[in-house]
């Protein structure tokens, strides 16, 4: 029974992912958000490496210590809900900043910060979706699948935390140069 549920969840996730990735989609163009976010790291491979590659090492290490369980996922869901609300608040603050009267670099930083915040919302929603699916399936025996899913959850969580630091730094620069 659990194998059928797992297969259905994987198939549903893949179909959903494929429906969100088409280029120039008027529904939700996640691809362009990801491309714009990764352009922020253009010319600075060390920051890209630190924010997106190093967390792989951390997540592999954490999975060896402990896979996700019901308690971890419940706490993560609470934190993610708070973060999503916070990111929407940050978006409203960024929208209120008038970047048109500023110089080009200020406007570029404002746009990049806005894009990074949207990227964070998407990561949090993805993490929340994965977390809910694992909770609904409710199988927490140490299997290869649980280790892989735990690694993905830990990886995305670390990436979210590191990107929060990027957003904080950018918002500070925006307000210092106001």
Place the predicted regions along the sequence by residue.
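Alpha-helical transmembrane segments of integral membrane proteins, especially early/N-terminal helices
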Residues: 6-12, 36-55, 78-87, 116-126
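Amphipathic, membrane-active segments
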Residues: 106-138
């Amino acid at each position: 029974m659990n194998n059928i549920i797992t297969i259905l969840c994987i198939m549903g996730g893949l179909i959903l992912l494929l429906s969100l990735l088409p280029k120039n989609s008027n529904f939700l163009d996640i691809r362009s958000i990801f491309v714009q976010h990764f352009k922020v790291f253009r010319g600075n491979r060390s920051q890209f490496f630190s924010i997106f590659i190093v967390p792989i090492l951390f997540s592999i290490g954490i999975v060896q210590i402990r896979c996700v369980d019901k308690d971890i996922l419940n706490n993560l869901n609470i934190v993610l809900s708070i973060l999503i609300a916070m990111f929407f608040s940050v978006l409203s603050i960024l929208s209120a900043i008038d970047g048109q009267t500023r110089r080009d670099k200020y406007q570029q930083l404002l746009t990049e910060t806005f894009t990074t915040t949207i990227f964070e919302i998407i990561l949090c929603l993805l993490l929340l979706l994965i977390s809910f699916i694992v909770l609904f399936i409710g199988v927490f025996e140490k299997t290869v699948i649980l280790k892989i899913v735990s690694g993905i959850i830990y990886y995305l969580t670390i990436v979210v935390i590191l990107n929060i630091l990027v957003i904080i730094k950018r918002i500070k620069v925006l307000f210092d140069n106001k």
